[in-house]
Amino acid sequence: AANQHLCGAHLVEALYLVCGERGFFYTPNKVGIVEQCCHSPCSLYDLENYCN
């Protein structure tokens, strides 16, 4: 899949899809996934780094 900008609910949804039952770390007040995926586009591989 092409890299895409994912913010807010879209980002959480994508994490659910990628991580499934493993769950994930989502701390919106921390730098990291929002910088990586919202402010600039990220890939599914990037998202997988945030799975538990």
Swiss-Prot record:
SMART domains for the chain: IlGF
Keywords: Carbohydrate metabolism, Disulfide bond, Glucose metabolism, Hormone, Secreted
Annotated Gene Ontology cellular component terms: extracellular space
Listed GO biological process terms: glucose metabolic process
Superkingdom of this protein's organism: Eukaryota
Subcellular location: Secreted
Disulfide bridge map: 7-38, 19-51, 37-42
InterPro entries assigned to the protein according to its UniProt record, in alphabetical order: Insulin, Insulin-like, Insulin-like_sf, Insulin_CS, Insulin_family
A GO MF label: hormone activity
Keyword ATP-binding: no
Principal place of residence: secreted
Complex formation: Heterodimer of a B chain and an A chain linked by two disulfide bonds.
Function: Insulin decreases blood glucose concentration. It increases cell permeability to monosaccharides, amino acids and fatty acids. It accelerates glycolysis, the pentose phosphate cycle, and glycogen synthesis in liver.
Protein family membership: Belongs to the insulin family.
Protein name: Insulin-2
